[in-house]
């Protein structure tokens, strides 16, 4: 689909408000929905779900059908890239991803098999786009190279990032370069198969000091965006360097992202004053899950602050699994009517 014809893509490309504030939520498809739990009840392997074209199509469309979201985001995971590179990726219920730690860039496969390996996901993108109303965006995505690298070196999620931050700098840089190369190919394929917006999730960006943030987040992101825009000149790309703090400003100014998603720790007045591109965010998902009254109150405050800007309503991170569906419905109804 030609980018720019959907509501969210228009807001990003025109860099101006689009009337009603649109809404979609990170992790809007997933465990918070009873229809999701039913659809995957006989599936024991999360990666098998991600490579099942028909199931991915169904899961991607579920929140759009239930809540009338303004965008669908393809149901997948940022560790697809790790799997493509030959890492042993498993998801353990209640724990998260468990990966055999990578100790050298020589352990990683090349990009030759990426289209073949990810074809079930790409075909799901094509199917979703064909079933999605034309005014609704289809968001493709990948993890930021730093974040994917931290997962495969740490062997999963981490609170300290002690292994990756003490990794040989030259080896870490090569691993990030390899991930960047594959990510470029993967995202371009997602666009070719029908995604009309892309989001880069650098979930672990906040673990880095300013010099390392520039080397491991800004530079790889810039390379990805230049490669995409060399093929698709004004394609809308949202960056999400979670917990970057004041470095959000450098990220917006130096990477070339079309828009930025801000986490819930970013003061909205600071964001409005310092981030001069379309904004997305930033309701605390804990409020949405556990305090509907406060969530609605805070959502109104966010909209009041940003409604005169090009703005997309979202959370400051993903929907929590135990978020009541009635809370999500109330939020969507509020944003669409406020």
Curated annotation (Swiss-Prot):
Q: List the disulfide bonds.
A: none
What general EC class does the enzyme of this chain belong to? lyase
What reaction gets catalysed by this protein?
uroporphyrinogen III + 4 H(+) = coproporphyrinogen III + 4 CO2
Entry annotated with the keyword Transferase: no
Which ranges does the record mark as transmembrane? none
Q: Where does substrate bind?
A: 27-31, 77, 151, 203, 317
Q: Which UniProt keywords apply?
A: Cytoplasm, Decarboxylase, Lyase, Porphyrin biosynthesis
Q: In which pathway does it act?
A: Porphyrin-containing compound metabolism; protoporphyrin-IX biosynthesis; coproporphyrinogen-III from 5-aminolevulinate: step 4/4
Provide the function of this protein.
Catalyzes the decarboxylation of four acetate groups of uroporphyrinogen-III to yield coproporphyrinogen-III.
What assembly does the database describe for this protein? Homodimer.
PANTHER family of this UniProt entry? METHYLTETRAHYDROFOLATE:HOMOCYSTEINE METHYLTRANSFERASE RELATED, UROPORPHYRINOGEN DECARBOXYLASE
**What is the official name of this protein in its record?**
Uroporphyrinogen decarboxylase
Query: Could you tell me which species this protein originates from?
Result: Wolbachia sp. subsp. Drosophila simulans (strain wRi)
Q: Which gene encodes it?
A: hemE
């Amino acid at each position: 689909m030609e980018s720019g014809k959907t509501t969210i893509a228009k807001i990003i490309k025109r860099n101006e408000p689009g009337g009603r504030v649109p809404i979609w939520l990170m992790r809007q498809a997933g465990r918070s929905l009873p229809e999701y739990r039913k659809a995957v009840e006989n599936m024991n392997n999360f990666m098998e779900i991600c490579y099942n074209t028909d199931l991915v199509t169904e899961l991607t469309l579920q929140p759009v059908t239930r809540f009338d979201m303004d965008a669908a985001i393809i149901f997948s995971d940022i560790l697809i890239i790790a799997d493509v590179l030959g890492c042993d990726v498993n998801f353990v219920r209640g724990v998260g991803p468990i990966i055999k730690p990578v100790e050298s860039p020589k352990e990683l496969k090349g990009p030759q098999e990426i289209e073949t390996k990810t074809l079930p996901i790409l075909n799901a993108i094509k199917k979703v786009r064909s079933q999605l109303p034309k005014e609704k965006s289809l968001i493709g995505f990948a993890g930021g190279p730093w974040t994917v690298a931290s997962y495969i070196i740490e062997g999963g999620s981490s609170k300290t990032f002690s292994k990756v931050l003490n990794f040989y700098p030259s080896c870490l840089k090569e691993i990030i370069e390899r991930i960047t190369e594959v990510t470029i190919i993967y995202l371009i394929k997602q666009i070719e198969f029908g995604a009309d917006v892309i989001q880069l999730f650098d979930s672990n960006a906040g673990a880095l000091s300013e010099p390392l943030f520039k080397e491991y987040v800004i530079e790889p992101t810039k390379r990805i965006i230049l490669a995409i825009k060399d093929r698709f000149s004004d394609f809308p790309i949202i960056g999400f360097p979670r917990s970057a703090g004041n470095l959000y400003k450098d990220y917006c100014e130096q990477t070339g992202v079309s828009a930025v998603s801000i986490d819930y720790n970013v003061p909205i007045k600071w964001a409005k004053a310092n981030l001069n591109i379309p904004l997305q965010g930033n309701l605390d998902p804990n409020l949405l899950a556990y305090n509907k009254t406060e969530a609605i109150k805070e959502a109104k405050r966010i909209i009041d602050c940003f409604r005169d800007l090009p703005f997309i309503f979202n959370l400051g991170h993903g929907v929590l699994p135990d978020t009541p569906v009635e809370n999500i419905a109330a939020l969507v109804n509020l944003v669409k009517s406020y």
